[in-house]
Amino acid sequence: MSKTRRSPIAAAPIVLISLLVLPVAAGLWATMSPVLRPISGQDQGAFMSLWSWNGLWPAMRLSLVTGLAATLIGLAITAALFALFQGHRIFRVFLRLVAPFLAVPHATAALALTFILAPSGWIMRGVVTLFNALGIPISQTPPDFITINDPGGLALIFGLVIKEVPFLVLMCVAAWGQCDAPRRRLVASALGYGRITGFWLTIWPVLYPQLRLPIFAVLAYSMTTVDMAMILGPSLPPSLAVQISKWITLPEPLYQGMAAAAAVVQLTLVAAMLLVWRFLELMGRAISRAQFQNGIRGSSLDGPIKFFGLVFGLVGFG
C-alpha cells in the first residue's frame, strides 16, 4: 500500500506561525536580557530601580485610564452611529469621509487638535473675534486653564477617540454584511422594539464577535501610543510608553535596564486589560440577556442616543 503524500501546502500554517512567532520571541528575549542581568555599577536590579521611580504608578494609571476610556467611548460612538444611521443618507456621507481621515497619521491629527484646542488656538481666537465683532469687550490674553497636556489625559483621550472611531467604523462596515442586519432589524421592529433596543438585542450580539480583534488592537494601541501621548498627554509624569521611549534613548545602563523593565510592565498591563475587557464582555452579555427577558421595548431611548450619535459623529468626521 502506497503512503499518501502530504501536500507542501499543509505545512504553510506552521511556517507562517513560525515567521510570526520567532521575531516576537527574539524581541522578547532582547527586552528581557537587560532585566535579567545585573546593572553595572548599581546595587539593585532593573525592576527594583523601576519600582523606586516615583512616577511609576501615575504613569501606569494614566496608561490604563486613557486606553480603556478611549476604547469604550470610541466603541460607543461607533455602535450609536450604526444603530441610528446605518442605511440613511447621512451615513453614506460619513463613509465617504472615513477613508481619507483614516489615512491621516496619528501625530498629524494630534498636532491639528493642538492648534484647535489650545488656550490660544483657533477656537479661542474665533471666540475673541466674534466678541470683538459684536462690540463685547473681552480679554486678548489666552485663558488660564489647561486644555492640552492636562494631568488627567482628557485631551489624549479625545484625540484617540477622534482617530480610532473611523477605524472601528470601517471594521463595522466590513462585518455588517455578514450579520443579516436588515432581516434582524425588521423582526425586532415587528416585535415592537425601538431602533436602539432592536439593534442592541438582535444585531450587536452577532456584530461584536467580528469586531473583537480590532477592538483589542485599539485598546492595545491606546495604552501604548507614544506620538499622540507626547503631543496631547501630560508630561509630569508622562504615560508609561512615553517614559520608556525616553529611557531607551539614554546611553546609561541604568536607564536601559529600567526601560526594559518598564516594557515588561507595559506588556503585562496590556495583557491584563485585555482580560478585563473580556470580563466586561461577559457582563454585557448577562445584562443584554436580562434586558431581552424583561420585555421592555425601549423605544424612548432612540431620541437621546440619536442626538449623542449625531453630535459625536459630526465631531469625529468633521
Describe the function of each predicted region.
Residues 37, 49, 95, 99, ...:
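Short amphipathic alpha-helical coupling elements at transmembrane boundaries
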Residues 227-254:
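Glycine-rich helix-loop "coupling/hinge" segments at transmembrane-helix boundaries
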Residues 280-309:
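Flexible interhelical linker loops that connect adjacent transmembrane helices
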Residues 92, 185-188, 254-260:
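Loop-to-transmembrane helix entry/capping segments in MFS-fold secondary transporters
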Residues 42-53:
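A short amphipathic helical element positioned immediately N-terminal to and/or at the very start
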